[in-house]
Amino acid sequence: MKKDIHPKYDFITANCSCGNAIKIRSTVGHDLNLDVCGQCHPFYTGKQRDVATGGRVDRFNKRFSIPGAK
């Protein structure tokens, strides 16, 4: 078998913007900076917002709706 064909698999630190530091193993070779993690992501913290962007149909109906009608 060939020797030294696999990349190094070392411990690195993934630092989140909230201050959380996570020790993980990776082949990247340097520490990572994360925007969100499990402690600050809105889905996991329960502070999720309902973003209703609406589509083209909603925008059309809003623009051309008759005032006083349903």
Swiss-Prot record:
Residues bound to Zn(2+): C16, C18, C37, C40
Keywords: Metal-binding, Ribonucleoprotein, Ribosomal protein, RNA-binding, rRNA-binding, Zinc
Top-level taxon of the source organism: Bacteria
Cofactor binding, note field: Binds 1 zinc ion per subunit.
UniProt cofactor(s): Zn(2+)
Molecular functions (GO terms): metal ion binding; rRNA binding; structural constituent of ribosome
Pfam family, one: Ribosomal_L31
Gene Ontology biological-process entries: translation
Function of the protein: Binds the 23S rRNA.
Subunit and partners: Part of the 50S ribosomal subunit.
Similarity comment text for this entry: Belongs to the bacterial ribosomal protein bL31 family. Type A subfamily.
Protein name: Large ribosomal subunit protein bL31
Organism in which the protein naturally occurs: Enterobacter sp. (strain 638)
Gene assigned in the entry: rpmE
